[in-house]
Amino acid sequence: MLRLRCKTREGTQLLQGLTDRSSIRELQERIAGVTGISGPLQRVMVGFPPLSLDLSDEEATLKNMSIKSGDTLIVEEDKSKLRSATPPVSKTDIGNWNAPAQPTIVRRVVPADNSCLFTSIYYVVEGGVYDPACALEMRSLIAEIVASDQSAYCDAVLGKSNEEYCSWIRREDTWGGAIEVSILSKFYQCEICVVDTQTVRIDRFGEDSGYTKRVLLIYDGIHYDPLQRQFPDPDMPPMTVFSTTDDEALVQAMELADDARKKRQFTDVNQFALRCMACQKGLTGQSAARDHAKETGHTNFGEV
């Protein structure tokens, strides 16, 4: 049985009941069942970068089409097949013609909870699958990786013992950061670029590892969101996985971050006005809060 996903602008669905001996006709029937797009109007793409499949031979098998388990099929409605004829283009039409809008990098907002980093990374590496329930699984995955290599993930790297860290990261009230991004970059074998809206800087995890794929996140000081490429054609699903040679994606991500900085859409964690809820002492920034916690053991802080 093949494990296939079908991705449209409406979201991602599982395609069930198919094997490598299933025909193109059976594939189209399954796609029609989950998308509502009839077989003759389907445009199906697969791979990276996505390439259109030749669906003309309905009896060809999925094995012949090199479709394999784990593939995500990008499906669009081919509206050109709906048109019986194309009207001639007049000179007036040409004079009034405007160039189509270009694909652009946009933010896909996820909930501002303690797991926004994990939700964001899962969204981009899975090709636009939004699943808040993934956070628990990803936390456990990170804990298992860290526990399996105590020499690499020692006190100096983690800021706490290996065992303490593994218990800490499994908790739903803890935040992920650079350590977790680095681990997930290695696990998913892709470069993860984090664009900081305060400094308009890109931190590139896995940059020197020779990966061919890249995903993008944007960070405002306390919250992560995934970035995706939006296309002018509303039937074209967003792109979340890029080639590491796609410098245009990085340029547009920087422009997006700079625009957010100009609008002051960031949180300077070093200037937070905080109060210790145990002794009511006023503090400024996360460094002061961290020092106070070490000195007193107080760990409950509120923003003023």
UniProtKB/Swiss-Prot annotation:
Q: Where in the cell is it found?
A: Cytoplasm
Record keywords: Cytoplasm, Hydrolase, Metal-binding, Protease, Thiol protease, Ubl conjugation pathway, Unfolded protein response, Zinc, Zinc-finger
GO cellular component: a single term: cytosol
Question: EC top class, in one word?
Answer: hydrolase
Q: Which residues form the signal peptide?
A: none
Matching entries from InterPro entries are given as: OTU1_Ubl, OTU_dom, Papain-like_cys_pep_sf, Ubiquitin-like_domsf, Znf_C2H2_type
The UniProt entry annotates the active site at: D113, C116 (nucleophile), H223, H298
Q: Does the keyword Metal-binding apply?
A: yes
The residues listed in the UniProt record as binding substrate, with positions renumbered to this chain, are I222
Q: Primary place of residence?
A: cytoplasm
Instruction: Please give the catalytic activity noted in the UniProt record.
Output: Thiol-dependent hydrolysis of ester, thioester, amide, peptide and isopeptide bonds formed by the C-terminal Gly of ubiquitin (a 76-residue protein attached to proteins as an intracellular targeting signal)
Q: Where is this region: S2 site?
A: 247-252
Name the segments for region: UBX-like: 5-83
Q: What is its EC number?
A: 3.4.19.12
Q: What does this protein do?
A: Hydrolase that can remove conjugated ubiquitin from proteins and participates in endoplasmic reticulum-associated degradation (ERAD) for misfolded lumenal proteins. May act by triming the ubiquitin chain on the associated substrate to facilitate their threading through the VCP/p97 pore. Ubiquitin moieties on substrates may present a steric impediment to the threading process when the substrate is transferred to the VCP pore and threaded through VCP's axial channel. Mediates deubiquitination of 'Lys-27'-, 'Lys-29'- and 'Lys-33'-linked polyubiquitin chains.
The protein's name is: Ubiquitin thioesterase OTU1
Q: What taxonomic ancestry is recorded?
A: Eukaryota, Metazoa, Chordata, Craniata, Vertebrata
